[in-house]
Amino acid sequence: MIKGRFPHMFKPRVYITRQIFPDALDLIEKSADLELWPEDEPPSPEQLREAMADVDGAIINVMDRIDAPLLDAAPKLKVLSQVAAGLDNIDVPEATKREILVGYTPGVLAKSTADLAFGLLLAVARRVVESDKWVREGNWKISHHPMFWL
């Protein structure tokens, strides 16, 4: 045996609570045995506790509440990774007390939020919603003047 190294005789078990990109699944599957929640709706707290009872890690979503009762039901859990910018749904002090590593994706939505904000600003400034409704109602046949929709 080489000192300081441990041969991996098994892959850690990882539970994923939502669909993620196939490329990410392929990458994770190279080093872990995966179990993926198959539904679009989130698992109930009971389903989540049951699924995490024998896993080493989990990739979760902001809709999954990770609290002391869930952590009690997941004695092997060593790492949690949240696919979200915040940690409001995770009892981080409790996870830390149990030496469970917690990761998340801060800033992941910053550009998308900025894009949406500018889109909404343009929609309001150019009256896009009102114009869309007007056209859908068949009013586009009516003549307009230079001050129209200003």
Locate the predicted segments by residue:
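Phosphate-binding beta-alpha-beta segment of Rossmann-like dinucleotide-binding domains, i.e.
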Residues: 98-100, 106-150
